[in-house]
């Protein structure tokens, strides 16, 4: 029997990526921060912008925000000849010289350029699917790489980033549409233009979500700085609330757990305020 009682529903979107940076070299080991930003985090903002009556709580992990900041700083320094881009995949997109064919570095970039959903991303674009098919051959028979040029890899890198591009960006960006129509033989100017789009999307994430919050459409919240499980820092026994039979250390709490938990929250607020220019409404 249907009930007349209305149940409030809160849609909470949790935007989280762990730290992918090698602390020794500051190099990014995986590209998921900037790829999910140009795809999912951007599209989510666009859907909310297009539907003024929609409401949502959006939570950002501080380590994600810090990595977006790092990408922006590195790209800006690279533009001015004052530094390198610390993500091998993004750096290769605009590299003047790509690795020599047949080398492990060349094959490594091929591998990275295939890390995408086959049906929803790769096969959606005939040009990308064709490049991916050739790439599979070169992966299985590396000795054949000597017969191809760096043009193959530069086109594959461009299509990898085009494939990951958010749908709303694809529909609105003349640059993205032009590159898709061109399809192959991408020039250095094409690759730099694509990097410009990526930079613009990354730099726009903070202002867009801040504006949505100011309009009252979004409540912005933040997680502990490193996404730490604060109850466990304070009381290891809290784990038994979800897993009664779990084996736990003899200690009742993590060393300096309360102080560490307080630092996690304070550092989270600091990063959030720096990125969005406002304090979080929830934590």
Predicted regions mapped to residue ranges:
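Catalytic cores of glycan-processing enzymes that make or break glycosidic bonds
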Residues: 2-282
């Amino acid at each position: 029997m249907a009930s007349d009682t209305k149940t409030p529903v809160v849609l909470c979107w949790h935007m989280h990526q762990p730290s992918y940076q090698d602390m020794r070299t500051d190099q990014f080991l995986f590209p998921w921060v900037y790829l999910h930003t140009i795809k999912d985090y951007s599209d989510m903002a666009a859907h909310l912008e297009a539907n003024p009556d929609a409401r949502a709580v959006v939570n950002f992990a501080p380590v994600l925000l810090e990595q977006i900041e790092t990408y922006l700083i590195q790209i800006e320094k690279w533009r001015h000849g004052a530094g390198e881009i610390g993500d091998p995949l993004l750096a290769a997109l605009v590299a003047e010289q790509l690795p020599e064919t047949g080398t492990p570095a060349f094959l490594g970039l091929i591998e990275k350029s295939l890390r995408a959903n086959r049906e929803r991303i790769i096969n959606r674009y005939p040009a990308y699917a064709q490049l991916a098919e050739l790439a599979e051959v070169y992966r299985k028979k590396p000795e054949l790489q000597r017969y191809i040029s760096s043009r193959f890899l530069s086109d594959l890198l461009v299509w990898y980033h085009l494939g990951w591009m958010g749908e709303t960006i694809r529909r609105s960006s003349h640059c993205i549409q032009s590159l898709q129509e061109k399809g192959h033989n991408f020039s250095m100017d094409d690759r730099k233009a694509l990097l410009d789009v990526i930079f613009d999307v990354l730099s726009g994430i903070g202002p867009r979500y801040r504006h949505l919050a100011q309009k009252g459409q979004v409540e912005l919240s933040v997680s502990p700085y490193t996404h730490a499980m604060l109850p466990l820092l304070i009381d290891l026994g809290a784990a038994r609330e979800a897993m009664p039979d779990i084996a736990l250390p003899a200690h009742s709490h993590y060393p300096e757990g309360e102080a560490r938990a307080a630092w996690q929250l304070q550092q989270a607020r600091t990063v959030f305020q720096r990125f969005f220019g406002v304090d979080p409404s929830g934590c």
